[in-house]
Design a protein with these regions (language model features):
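A short SAM/SAH-binding and catalytic strip from SAM-dependent methyltransferases
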Residues: 144-155
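Core SAM-dependent methyltransferase catalytic element
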Residues: 210-230
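A short acidic, Gly/Pro-enriched loop at the edge of an enzyme's catalytic core
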Residues: 130-145
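A short glycine-rich, Lys/Arg-flanked "PGG" loop and its adjoining helix->strand segment in the class I
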Residues: 158-173
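Class I SAM-dependent methyltransferase Rossmann-like catalytic core
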Residues: 2-79
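Class I SAM-dependent methyltransferase SAM/SAH-binding core
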Residues: 86-134
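Conserved class I S-adenosyl-L-methionine
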Residues: 175-202
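Phosphate-coordination loops involved in phosphoryl transfer and adenosine-cofactor binding
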Residues: 82
């Protein structure tokens, strides 16, 4: 191992691995004419695949908005309208870009690297190159926070939840979707426990909970929690 690699932080190593996956695995699928995730057409009611790369990217983004609502058991398609919505760790999937919010924000520590790689869509969304544990936004100013398949990627999951609660207005909604009981990896270093995550929500009201039989990653399984701020 080269000397400089030995002294690099775990966060830097994790970031390199994240970027490599998006560039070497995810983006080639889209450029080859596919979708990743592969259920985009079902979520878009059978809409035929777009002819262009950018068109497919926007289809992925719009499907991601529908996916979040469906998984959270939110039937109102206008749920995000006129709200301030924050997505924690969106990557380049495009949820912040397609979300029909009054203000749509992606908190993504790799935002600049995604932009440099031309993986971010051109939209009105704001991407903050910030950690989930220290978001540069004022307390009690956000209506909805989404963290889909990102809680086990952050540096400190409990601190990320505390930060989300700081940001939410009274009555605000936190939508979590995360793997539990999985083997830690360089990009997903935390083996989360559903009961422990619930304990971090403390005074919040659980509005919806779902336990999947499959994971986002390689093993374990996913849990969906939708919680309301008091």
């Amino acid at each position: 191992m080269r000397l400089h690699e030995r002294f690099r932080s775990p966060a830097a190593i994790k970031g390199d691995a994240e970027i490599a996956w998006w560039l070497r695995v995810w983006d080639p699928i889209v450029r080859a004419g596919g979708f990743s995730p592969g259920d985009v057409q079902q979520l878009l009611d059978g809409e035929p695949p777009a002819d262009s790369y950018q068109g497919r990217r926007w289809q992925l983004a719009r499907a991601e908005v529908r996916r979040v609502l469906r998984e959270a058991n939110i039937e109102d398609p206008s749920f995000f309208h006129e709200k301030v919505v924050v997505d924690i760790g969106p990557g380049p999937l495009g949820f912040p870009d397609a979300c029909p919010a009054r203000v749509s924000i992606g908190v993504e520590p790799l935002a600049q690297r995604f932009a440099d790689a031309r993986l971010l869509l051109d939209s009105h969304a704001v991407y903050l190159a910030a950690r989930a544990e220290a978001v540069p936004l004022v307390s009690n100013t956000v209506d909805v926070i989404v963290a889909r398949n990102s809680l086990d990627h952050v540096d400190d999951p409990r601190a990320a939840i505390a930060e989300a609660r700081r940001l939410l207005r009274p009555g605000g909604t936190l939508i979590l979707n995360f793997d539990v009981e999985h083997t830690p990896t360089p990009t997903e270093p935390h083996a989360l426990d559903a009961d422990e995550v619930r304990s971090w929500l403390s005074a919040m009201t659980i509005a919806h909970e779902d336990v999947w039989d499959h994971p986002h990653g390689h093993d374990g399984h996913a849990v969906v929690l939708v919680a309301r701020q008091p």
